[in-house]
Amino acid sequence: MKQLKSLSTFALSAALAGASILAWPMAADAEYPERPLTLIVPWGAGGGTDATGRMIAGLLQDELGQPVNVVNRTGGSGVVGHSAIATAEPDGYTIGVVTVEIGMMHWAGLTELTGKDYTPIALYNYDAAGIQVRADSEWETAGDFIDAVKANPGKFKGSGTGQGGIWHLALAGMLNDAGAGADGAPWVPSKGAAPGLQELVAGGVDVVTSSVVEASALIAAGRVKSLAVMGEERLGAFAAVPTLKEATGSDWQMAAWRGVAGPAGMPDEATAKISAALEVVWNSDEFQEFMKGRGFGLVWKPGAEFATWMENSDAALGTVMQAVGLAK
């Protein structure tokens, strides 16, 4: 009896072990994602990056079938949040919104991070810099303004953001590219486009570089006019405003942009799944209406295209930052 009992116990153990072995492939092959995702936003709540990130998270979770929790990781001029994305476990469960500043921070000596430290998923937003002047300005084209700066270096002042911000670099880069000197129009720092535009209307500065949308109310009121946009094509809502290339022949472009990325080394399956879901989100009526209603520019560049975009943006920003003495 004792021997029979031992054999029965052995048979039961073997059966359980076999069941475990058979169950293992099923567990290993479970479809991604199996649990909630985290989307890191490297800027504060209430801003444009936060707003677009939260909209994406809400729609993305419907496509992925798992919650996508937004976490704001702020500080260090964007370094804290961008670092958190890059150093997260590359398992496909932590992604984030990366912004144009990833191509600025390392040039400024704030971090060693570059776009190569991420798995690029998709670029979804692009707001080209516009050249805004007073409505009664004698300058009718971007070429007129550039010629005036060349003839009178240091006379005309620009504004639109803080020193070294994206709109400052847009103006400095355009002037540098045109041979007018990156500092041909001295920069007056402001706490954003809105106060810069008010200073423009008041006569304290002569030009403001910002997105055209940020100047739209003053343009509609007949107090400001936009001479050109530093983008690939004209803006749908401001089709009368030419591109810088159309206005001057220059290939210089500069824009604020946002995209979704994860840490380098993410599994291909997770990257492909998120990318496909994000494309559905981007094309949805809800997302398109949200972006257009708030004046955010729309662009779609997945994977490798986004990686190339980041490389080109980094190179352009580095050139300007070196020219104006902001690179470390």
Task: For every predicted segment, state its role.
Residues 29-117, 155, 180-207, 298-301, ...:
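N-terminal (or domain-start) structured segment
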Residues 25-27:
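N-terminal signal peptide c-region/cleavage motif recognized by signal peptidases
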Residues 96-102, 106, 193, 210-215, ...:
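Beta->alpha turn/N-cap motifs
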Residues 34-36, 268-328:
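An extracytoplasmic/periplasmic, membrane-proximal ligand-sensing/linker region
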Residues 126, 214-283, 312-315, 320:
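C-terminal lobe and pocket-closing loops
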Residues 57-61, 175, 219:
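Conserved hydrophobic residues forming the short capping helix/wall of the S-adenosyl-L-methionine
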Residues 2-15:
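Bacterial N-terminal signal peptides that target proteins for export
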Residues 84-93, 107-195, 244-246, 257-290:
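Hinge/capping helix and adjacent helix->loop/strand transition within the periplasmic-binding protein
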